[in-house]
Design a protein with these regions (language model features):
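Conserved Lys-Pro-Asp/Glu-containing loop-to-beta segment of HAD-superfamily phosphomonoesterases
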Residues: 130-155
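Short, charged, surface-exposed secondary-structure boundary motifs
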Residues: 85-89, 118-120, 177-184
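Active-site-proximal specificity loops/subdomain of glycosyltransferases
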Residues: 112-130
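Acidic, PIN/NYN-like endoribonuclease modules and their adjacent C-terminal/linker elements
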Residues: 159-184
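Short, conserved loop/helix-junction motifs that constitute active-site signature segments
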Residues: 38-41, 142-145, 162
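Short, charged/polar "capping" segments at the starts of alpha-helices
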Residues: 53-59, 156-160, 177-178
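Alpha-helical substrate-recognition element adjacent to the catalytic core
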Residues: 1-117
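Short, hydrophobic beta-strand segments that form beta-sheet elements in well-ordered domains
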Residues: 46-48, 148-152, 169
Length: 184
């Protein structure tokens, strides 16, 4: 992805949702994303993150420490939206469920129910419910706050919910639009 590619995609959007880790900071294209935020203060940039608790509280420090572009800072963002502890637990800290959050959600659900239960000690129905409670947070927040695009590295888990919420999803690692439903 080039900066020109990014500008072409984001020029059609006034309100943009940004993931933090592996996107705005410590990511392959973080320099491009930071530059875009700095170059476009006229847009409404929102941070939408799975950070919660102490990680959310240290967000400003992490943005500062991982700043690549001069002028990049938390003051450029219209809003910061972190997930609740309860919803975070549903996707990332389930002790009875060892499913890696990077697994493809749709593929995991193709496992026969009895095998799924034996492997993960949780029913597919409960897994699907927990997955929705956690991973629909970003697309739902984007829709509620008027963001028409989400830039995120965790596209496998976000795709389904972005489609449901009519939010375009840009893969922050590969630079590709993952769903093409939105017509700006």
């Amino acid at each position: 992805m080039t900066y020109e590619d990014l500008k072409a995609i984001l020029s059609q959007h006034q309100t943009i949702g940004w993931d933090v880790d592996a996107t705005l900071i410590r990511g392959k294209n973080s320099h491009l994303f930071q530059q875009y935020v700095v170059d476009h203060p006229d847009k409404n940039h929102h941070i939408v993150t799975f950070r919660t608790g102490s990680l959310l509280r240290r967000l400003e420090i992490d943005l500062s420490v991982n700043k690549i572009m001069p002028g990049f800072n938390i003051g450029l963002f219209t809003g910061v939206h972190g997930i609740s502890e309860a919803h975070f637990e549903k996707g990332f800290s389930k002790t009875q469920c060892v499913i890696n959050y990077n697994d493809n959600y749709e593929n995991v659900l193709l496992i026969p129910p009895a095998r799924f239960q034996a492997l993960y000690k949780i029913s597919q129905e409960q897994y699907a419910k927990d997955h929705r409670e956690c991973f629909s947070f970003k697309p739902h927040t984007c829709k509620a706050k008027g963001m028409t695009i989400l830039v995120d590295d965790m596209v496998a888990d976000q795709r389904k919910y972005c489609i449901e919420n009519n939010v375009l999803l840009l893969d922050s690692i590969n630079g590709h639009i993952v769903n093409g439903l939105l017509k700006p």
